[in-house]
C-alpha cells in the first residue's frame, strides 16, 4: 500500500510540530529551573559541599583525594567542583551555578522519559514538578550535593533504557552507552549501582517476548562493559598516580563498614524524623503518586507498573543504604515519585470530563495539589531570606550560614602557609580561609564510627597534627562523635594538646535567633557572653608563643 501525496506531506508537518513542541518544552523547563535556583545561588556551603570544595581546590595544586585527603565519596564530585571553581565567579555561586545546569539537564531528561507514557503536556508537568521539588529546602535541594550531580547521568540512563526496552533497536551500542551513563552516576555516588541492578532485573519483564533471554543477557553484558570501561579508566588514573589502594579503601572498603554502623532501631528513628520533615511539602504529592501507581495497572498495563514500582524500590534501597536518612538522600526518590504523581494527577484530571467542571478549574486544582505545599515552603527562600538566613533555616543548629564571616576573620589572623586543625566536621571553614588542614582527615566522622581500626586511625591523625603544628584549632565536636561504641582517644588527646600548647582566641556564640558570632578574647580573658546567648560548643584557639 502506498501513501497518498496528502499523507506524505502531512507526516513531515506532524514531525515539525512535534519537534517545535519538544524544543519549546525543553526551553520552558530550563527557564523555570533557572528561575527557581538563581535566587538561591549564594547560600553558603554546608559541610558536604565544604569537603568537596576543599578537595576541588587542592586538585589545582596536584593533590589527590584519597591519597592526600581522606574522603569516602567517589571521585566525580571533586572534579565537578574543580570545574566550577575554575569559573570567574564567586566560588559558592559558581558551584551552585554548575549544580543548576545539572538540575536543568535532569529535568529535561525526566521530560523525555515522561512523555513516552504521559504524552507531551503531562511530560512537561512532570519535569516542572521535578524542578520545583528538587530545589525544596526541606530536602536540602539548594546544596550542590552528590545526589544533584548523580541525577543527570542516572536519568540519561533511563532515557536510553526505555529506548532499548520499548524500541528494541539499540543493538549493542545503546547498552554500552547506558552502562557508561550508569558508571558516571556511580562515580558521583555509589548507591547509583542499585539503579543498574534494577535495570538488569526488570529488563526481561519490560522487553518483548521474542528472544527475551538472549536479549536480556546481551543487555546485561554490554551495559556491564560500558561501566567497566568507565571505571577501568578511573582505576588506571589512580594507579598511574600511586593512589589505587587509597582509592579502593576510601570509596569501597570504608563504605562497606560505614553502612553497617547504624542499628536498625536508630535507622527507623532517623527515617521517621526525616519523612515527617519532608511531609510538610511533599505529603499531597505522595498521595497523588499513590493514586497514580494504583491506577497504572488498568490504564497502562503491567510494564509501566513494573518499571515505576521497581525504580521506586531501587531508589529507596539507595536512600536506606547508610541508615542516616539525611533529607538530601531522598532526592534520588524524586524521579519515580514525580512520574507517579503526574500519572495520578492525570487520572484525577480525567474524572471531571464534560462541561460540569471547567478546564481552567481543573488545571488550577491540579496545580494547587501538586505544587501548593512546595511553593509555600520555597517562597520565603526566594523572596525574603538572606543567604545566611536561608542556611540557618535549612540547617538549624549548624554554623554554615556564619562560616564565611568566621573564615574571613581567620584568614586575616593567619598566614597562607599556616595550618588549621578542626576537631569537628566543618571543612567548609578550611575552604573559606584557603588554609590547609593539619591532618588528612578534613572532617572527623571516619575516625569516630564503631570501626575496628578507629584507634589506629586516630593515633595516625595525632601524629599528622603534631607534625603540622597547626596555628589554629577549631574545637567544635559533633554529636555523632559520641555515639555508643565510638573510640574517644582523639577526644582526650585533643583536650590535652590544647591545654599544653594553645590559648583561647575567641568564642563562637549563638543567639536566640540562631546567629553565630565570633567573640574575641581580650588580654587572655574570655569575652563577655550576652544574656540569652550560648557558647555554640565551638572555641577557636591560637598557639602559645
Locate predicted features:
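Specific aromatic-rich, kink-prone transmembrane helix
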Residues: 149-168, 174-182, 337-340
Amino acid at each position: 500500500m502506498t501513501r497518498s501525496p496528502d499523507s506524505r506531506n502531512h507526516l513531515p508537518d506532524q514531525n515539525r510540530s512535534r519537534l517545535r513542541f519538544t524544543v519549546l518544552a525543553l526551553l520552558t523547563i530550563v527557564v523555570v529551573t533557572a528561575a527557581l535556583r538563581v535566587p538561591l545561588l549564594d547560600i553558603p556551603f554546608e559541610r558536604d559541599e565544604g569537603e568537596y570544595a576543599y578537595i576541588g581546590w587542592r586538585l589545582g595544586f596536584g593533590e589527590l583525594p584519597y591519597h592526600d585527603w581522606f574522603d569516602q565519596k567517589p571521585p566525580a564530585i571533586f572534579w565537578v567542583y574543580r570545574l566550577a571553581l575554575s569559573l570567574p565567579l564567586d566560588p559558592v555561586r559558581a558551584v551552585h551555578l554548575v549544580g543548576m545546569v545539572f538540575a536543568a539537564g535532569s529535568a529535561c531528561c525526566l521530560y523525555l522519559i515522561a512523555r513516552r507514557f504521559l504524552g507531551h503536556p503531562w511530560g512537561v508537568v512532570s519535569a516542572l514538578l521535578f524542578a520545583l521539588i528538587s530545589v525544596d529546602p526541606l530536602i536540602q535541594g539548594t546544596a550542590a550535593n552528590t545526589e544533584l550531580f548523580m541525577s543527570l547521568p542516572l536519568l540519561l540512563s533511563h532515557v536510553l533504557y526505555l529506548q532499548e526496552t520499548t524500541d528494541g533497536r539499540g543493538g549493542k551500542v545503546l547498552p554500552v552507552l547506558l552502562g557508561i551513563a550508569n558508571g558516571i552516576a556511580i562515580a558521583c555516588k555509589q548507591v547509583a549501582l542499585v539503579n543498574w541492578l534494577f535495570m538488569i532485573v526488570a529488563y526481561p519483564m519490560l522487553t518483548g517476548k521474542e528472544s527475551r533471554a538472549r536479549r536480556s543477557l546481551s543487555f546485561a553484558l554490554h551495559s556491564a562493559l560500558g561501566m567497566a570501561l568507565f571505571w577501568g579508566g578511573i582505576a588506571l588514573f589512580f594507579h598511574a598516580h600511586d593512589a589505587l589502594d587509597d582509592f579502593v579503601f576510601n570509596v569501597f572498603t570504608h563504605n562497606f563498614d560505614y553502612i553497617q554502623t547504624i542499628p536498625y532501631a536508630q535507622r527507623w528513628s532517623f527515617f521517621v524524623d526525616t519523612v515527617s520533615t519532608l511531609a510538610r511539602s511533599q505529603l499531597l504529592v505522595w498521595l497523588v503518586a499513590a493514586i497514580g501507581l494504583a491506577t497504572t495497572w488498568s490504564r497502562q498495563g503491567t510494564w509501566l507498573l513494573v518499571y515505576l514500582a521497581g525504580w521506586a524500590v531501587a531508589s529507596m534501597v539507595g536512600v536506606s543504604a547508610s541508615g542516616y536518612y539525611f533529607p538530601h538522600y531522598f532526592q534520588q526518590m524524586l524521579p519515580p515519585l514525580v512520574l507517579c504523581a503526574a500519572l495520578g494527577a492525570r487520572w484525577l484530571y480525567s474524572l471531571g470530563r464534560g462541561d460540569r467542571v471547567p478546564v481552567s478549574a481543573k488545571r488550577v486544582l491540579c496545580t494547587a495539589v501538586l505544587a501548593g505545599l512546595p511553593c509555600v515552603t520555597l517562597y520565603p527562600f526566594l523572596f525574603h531570606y538572606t543567604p545566611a538566613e536561608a542556611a540557618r533555616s535549612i540547617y538549624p543548629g549548624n554554623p554554615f550560614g556564619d562560616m564565611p564571616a568566621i573564615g574571613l576573620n581567620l584568614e586575616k589572623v593567619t598566614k597562607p602557609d599556616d595550618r588549621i586543625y578542626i576537631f569537628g566536621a566543618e571543612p567548609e571553614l578550611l575552604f573559606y580561609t584557603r588554609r590547609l588542614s593539619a591532618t588528612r582527615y578534613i572532617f572527623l566522622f571516619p575516625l569516630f564510627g564503631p570501626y575496628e581500626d578507629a584507634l589506629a586511625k586516630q593515633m595516625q591523625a595525632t601524629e599528622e597534627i603534631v607534625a603540622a603544628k597547626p596555628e589554629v584549632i577549631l574545637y567544635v565536636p559533633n554529636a555523632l562523635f559520641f555515639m555508643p561504641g565510638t573510640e574517644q582517644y582523639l577526644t582526650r588527646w585533643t583536650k590535652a594538646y590544647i591545654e599544653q600548647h594553645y590559648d583561647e582566641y575567641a568564642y563562637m556564640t549563638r543567639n536566640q535567633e540562631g546567629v553565630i558570632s565570633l567573640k574575641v578574647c581580650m588580654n587572655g580573658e574570655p569575652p563577655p557572653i550576652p544574656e540569652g546567648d550560648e557558647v555554640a560548643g565551638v572555641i577557636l584557639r591560637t598557639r602559645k608563643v
